[in-house]
A protein has these predicted regions:
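Polytopic transmembrane helical bundles with strong interfacial aromatic enrichment
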Residues: 1-147
Length: 147
């Protein structure tokens, strides 16, 4: 989220109030996520009982496609946070400007990452798990392909 906020701050937006409000909302989202992580996660907690066997990754998950698939999905989901921030800023400021021109590149970038991530995941599931094709998946897996 910080990276997308930084990229938006470099963007030339004609309305400075919109830019300031968007970055304020984006930074508030970052603050909320960081606060949630700080107060709910403890990296020093011990797991009981300790692992008796090795803690290797499942062999099905040891695939080059899965090294790219989750980060692509993450970039897509996080990329939509700046779209949310711009949309909320326009609603708060009650601007009549053509904010679609501002939103369009951010939506396209985020959508591209999501599409690539879902495509990689679908490709991996098709050849690795042998599910027999996309039409034999259950509805949850097919719903990820919907816009």
């Amino acid at each position: 989220m910080t990276f997308f906020g930084f990229l938006f701050s470099l963007n030339k937006v004609s309305d400075q109030n919109l830019k300031i409000k968007t970055l304020t909302i984006q930074n508030s989202l970052i603050f909320l996520v960081c606060g949630f992580i700080i107060f709910t996660s403890n990296p020093f907690s011990r797991s009981f009982p300790p692992n008796v066997e090795g803690s290797d990754l499942n062999p099905l998950l040891q695939d080059p496609g899965l090294a790219i698939h989750p980060p692509m999905l993450y970039l897509g989901y996080v990329g939509f946070s700046i779209v949310y921030s711009i949309s909320l800023a326009v609603l708060i400021l009650k601007k009549k400007t053509d904010f679609i021109k501002i939103l369009k590149p951010w939506v396209f970038i985020s959508w591209t990452f999501l599409t690539a991530g879902i495509g990689l995941g679908s490709w991996w599931a098709y050849y690795e798990l042998g599910w027999g094709g996309f039409w034999f998946w259950d509805p949850v897996e097919n719903a990820s392909l919907l816009p």
